[in-house]
Amino acid sequence: MTTEQEFEKVELTADGGVIKTILKKGDEGEENIPKKGNEVTVHYVGKLESTGKVFDSSFDRNVPFKFHLEQGEVIKGWDICVSSMRKNEKCLVRIESMYGYGDEGCGESIPGNSVLLFEIELLSFREAKKSIYDYTDEEKVQSAFDIKEEGNEFFKKNEINEAIVKYKEALDFFIHTEEWDDQILLDKKKNIEISCNLNLATCYNKNKDYPKAIDHASKVLKIDKNNVKALYKLGVANMYFGFLEEAKENLYKAASLNPNNLDIRNSYELCVNKLKEARKKDKLTFGGMFDKGPLYEEKKNSAN
């Protein structure tokens, strides 16, 4: 932790309970000061003033800490301090126990009535994400569409895991839509759901996560039982997961609906060949097991 030298010191409360020493000034301008409700991202080290012992550090975890400002998610002294900071500012803040963990403390590492010292660096902040429950139906559809398009951009760059996150995020907007009665919005919702689930099936097939590919392709077929792309992706996932009979059925139906699609036809032929090989192997393994009579046959001339 940085040693206190001749730095600017600011009393953030009238009683001196929260005192901030600025170690590195932040960016100028009002736009660089976080507001109530913003999601802030910080790095910090916390120690006890009495012993100098470090009890917590985001650096040790190598992961910055995020919280929503003035929402009761952290101790009061933190809300007061970080509210006064600017982006890229680094400070040392002294927090009396009434603004920290009080006379109860916090576990074994922070005894009651402890004065706390934190070195905090404000890395960034942004407006908190709006709750899905606060969106109008129109906003849900538009947001889901926009996020799906972001997923498509990741997919084009072959950033498959990033694309998966976006497609799933888009679908989250439709978790509670049972009471929708606007047919235009329902049709748009259906198209986005089909598109996202198809894309997720493709992504999971690429990642060889066949159970998840099966799940998302099946969701499309619940909406549109003759969706050729879903049948194809489901067939491919079933085939590579070892469900050859199901795969053959999926791919046969897809080929029947779209007989000119070479990818479907080639996958169907591959599946048929895999099925033949599997049956041949089964025959070699089990074919002669029972053709010599019962496993335990009495000897003809056994003694009574």
Swiss-Prot record:
Residues 37-126 form the PPIase FKBP-type domain. SUPFAM superfamilies: FKBP-like, TPR-like. InterPro entries: FKBP4/5/8-like, PPIase_dom_sf, PPIase_FKBP_dom, TPR-like_helical_dom_sf, TPR_rpt. The keyword Cytoplasm applies. It is found in: Cytoplasm; Nucleus. Homodimer. Interacts (via TPR repeats) with HSP90 (probably via MEEVD motif). Belongs to the FKBP-type PPIase family. This is Peptidyl-prolyl cis-trans isomerase FKBP35.
